Amino acid sequence: MKLLLFAAWFSSLLDPCRFLDICQSCHPNADCDDICKCRTGYTGNGISDCRDDNECETVPEICGLHANCTNYVGGYYCNCLSGFISNGTEQFQTNDGTSCNDINECEEDRKCGPNSKCHNNIGSFICSCLRGYTSPAGPWFMPNHGTDCIENSKIHCHQDHKCTKETVNSTLERMTNLSISERLKEIRYQTSAALSPVLLISYIEAMVSSKLNSGDVSKDSKEHVNETITNLVFSVNNLVEKDEKVEWKKINEDLRMYYVTKLLHTAEKETLALSAGYTHATQMQVHAGDVEMKLYTFEPRQAQKHPLSANIQGNSISLSTKKARHANNNGSTSVVFLIYHSIGDLLKPADDPGVADYSRYAAAGEITVNSPVIAAAISNQKTLPLNDVTFTLKHTQEIDPARDETKCAFWEYSPSMMGHWSLDGCIRTRVNTTHTSCSCNHLTHFAILMSSARANLLAHYNVLTRITQLGMVISLICLSMCIFTFWFFRDIQNTRTTIHKNLCCSLFMAQFIFLIGINKSAHKWFCSLIAGLLHYFFLAAFAWMCIEGIHLYLIVVGVIYNKGFLHRNFYAFGYGSPAVVVAISATLGYKYYGTSSVCWLSTENNFIWSFIGPAILIILVNLLAFAVIIYKVYRHTAVKKPEISHYENIRSCARGAIALLFVLGVTWAFGVMYILYETTLTAYLFTFANVFQGMFIFIFLCVLSRRIQEEYYRLFKNMPCCFECLR
């Protein structure tokens, strides 16, 4: 019986008429596939109910953040919001590859009108006035509302005390009825666009007037305190960011120092005052662009568990505390760290001895702030007494520790808000190319001061250039007279005058090409040619200086030599060896002849050493020859002429030594010192000694030579116009 019932049921399932009955019962908006299913865009049981599925309501943000959803019976479509444009069809659905992209309205010319600037935002844009102009609508406005940027009538207001006072009072009056949080929000908004000097002053005064105490914020929620502190940090950033430097520089230096100090002091104190609103341990960080802040609030007994340090963009600071004698665990303690990335230029180091005397370069150049300014403050030092502060600051410009002097300093200011940099209580612990580490025994605003050897030399660049030009003109005149002398007078012709003559010719060519071609860098090939000629003739001059030293050494030591053989070798060495060096250098690195600024050898890949190397070698050889010659001459005079006093002997040798220094080119050793130390002193010594080398050679080899004096006497004696002068 059971089997008969099962067979009957199974056969009913296989009955095709049954499937037909099911499909006939489906809703008009449903499809039949064994069962009734509502079509896409509808929802229900498929038989009695298939109503429209409103995707715009059931799937939040189905079209994405930048599009509107429009529902219709059985479906939906998306449209981009105003301020966005579709990269496909105007109407689209999710996941069909279409997206909404921001329209940059600022690409349209003069979108905001004359004397204004367009700022594109995601989905919109906004306008602000250019510096020197103002709008009745405020710092930000939309165009086509009758708003024009007109010339700011108060652009010079900061120079007049009465005008400044009126503007400050007007600003304060507008904020009289605002709460602390509302005031800081308004200041942030008003300072977010370009400011004039008088507005910088006005909004700093507005911030200072926001007197805070714990009662003002104790009832605020954590979120409200966070928002207020954020508005404070952004307001400070708006006042000191890089774009505002040009306006700060228009303010009198003393007044500028006063208001910057006031701002630093207020930012620190108000942040600590606002942190009193936190009822639980809190960590907070605000990044506002050029100003960043980190804040820690905790109970005093938890101080050891909380890191009293901050690391911000490669700058770090850490506080070391000691145990309080009378511990007070009531209330909370806050520690705030503030870093100002661009304020250093506004706090120019004073010329007081406490700062300026630290550098051996300071007397010749400017001391600069070469780091961000970092500040640290504690709300209650009685519960958290300070031991010391250690910090590492990143240099604004990389330094050479061997040439640039850095010191750890802090901004010391009085209750009258007048401040200056001081070194008291701070020591430098470590320095490298990019960072300086310090340790101080107090809290305040810290920075790294630097006196740069290169910066000092730049200050003397024009003077050194004029000395070089004048010296070379004088040297060229003197060298031409030397060449005439050694070439014209036959009675003085010998090996020594031949060497003198070739040395003078090489120096003349080198200095002449230097004078007319060193700055001709506009045409690369011509500049490379000038650099190659300078390389050759300066090396030739050094080679003949070396020959001077060797020849004098042979004479003093008393070596007998073949004059003809020696002459041939002298010429080969004097002109051949420089040619070999230049040929090899040009083959291996021809592209390093000439730079974008001067027609000389490039320092890339140490190519400059193709000149410095041979020059240093010759200087060392001549220094050795110089020492031997002076020693031999002194001993010879002492033995052969005992009647001459020791003092006279030394004085005679000194005169000869000075002459030899210039003839042998030993003064070029100042160039080596300049490369090693690059100080103002070595720059002047090198410039004076070498641009006037031709003049000194003329004085010592011609003017002070008795034989040449006699030759000139005979020459002028035969000239009637000059004879009377010689009588």
UniProtKB/Swiss-Prot annotation:
Residues 489-496, 557-568, 631-654 are cytoplasmic. It is a multi-pass membrane protein. One of its GO terms (cellular component) is plasma membrane. Residues 408-456 are annotated as: GPS. Residues 20-467, 518-535, 590-609, 676-682 are extracellular. Its main location: membrane. Disruption phenotype: Morpholino knockdown of the protein causes dramatic vascular impairment in embryos. Residues 282-456 form the GAIN-B domain. Pfam families: 7tm_2, EGF_CA, GAIN, GPS. The record marks 443-444 as: Cleavage. Keywords: Calcium, Cell membrane, Disulfide bond, EGF-like domain, Membrane, Repeat, Signal, Transmembrane, Transmembrane helix. Heterodimer of 2 chains generated by proteolytic processing; the large extracellular N-terminal fragment and the membrane-bound C-terminal fragment predominantly remain associated and non-covalently linked. This is Adhesion G protein-coupled receptor L4. It comes from Danio rerio.
